[in-house]
Amino acid sequence: MGSVGLLYVGAVLFVNGLMLLGTVPVRSASVLNLFVGALQCVVPTVMLIQAQGDSSAVLAASGLYLFGFTYLYVGISNLAGFEPEGIGWFSLFVACAALVYSFLSFTVSNDPVFGVIWLAWAALWTLFFLVLGLGRENLSRFTGWAAILLSQPTCTVPAFLILTGNFHTTPAVAAGWAGALLVLLGLAKILAAPKAAVPQPRPVFN
């Protein structure tokens, strides 16, 4: 069930990346944040009800609230005109929690691929903290591109693989996933770099 919510997290991360780049207006992006945030609160609640005390099911559901609260916070704050610092510092909490979930994926859940994915989310939410919490606006373009490029391989792609029964998690697959995500972060840095000014020809006067 969690994979259904993960599918739409890929969509909202993509849109939020475009919002950071100034391509999508803030209020327009807020609507999708509210939809996905609500979904990511309902889905884990249903999972907890169905878990019947199964610790692994409870663990799987608990992390989804991090996304639900993030997107509800973003949607409400943007529509109400709140300052971004609150979201930024909450993002620091999410980043720290993601490190714990990554460790648990490697050690308890025996899921190295999601261990890598949680590390990617930790890095991304750290960027959100720097931009929104500390006002590091010079990182906005890099963060926007990082959100766009990481949204699909960390959310949409694994969601579809799980939904179709084609998700496999081994150390070798996790290593490949990690390499691909690092390449995408490098690409985000390149895309975020300021474009060099094109020299204009000097006018010639007779």
Swiss-Prot record:
Main location (coarse class): membrane
Listed InterPro entries: AmiSUreI_transpt, AmiSUreI_transpt_sf
Pfam families the record matches: AmiS_UreI
Key words, A-Z: Cell membrane, Membrane, Transmembrane, Transmembrane helix, Transport
Gene3D superfamilies assigned to the protein according to its UniProt record, in alphabetical order: 1.25.40.600
Compartments in which it is found: Cell membrane
Topology with respect to the bilayer: Multi-pass membrane protein
Stretches that traverse the bilayer: 4-24, 29-49, 56-76, 86-106, 113-133, 142-162, 173-193
GO cellular component, one term: plasma membrane
Top-level lineage group: Bacteria
Physiological role: Possible transporter that might be responsible for the adsorption of amidase substrates or release of their hydrolysis products.
Family named by the database record: Belongs to the AmiS/UreI family.
Listed name of the protein: Putative transporter protein AmiS2
Recorded name of the encoding gene: amiS2
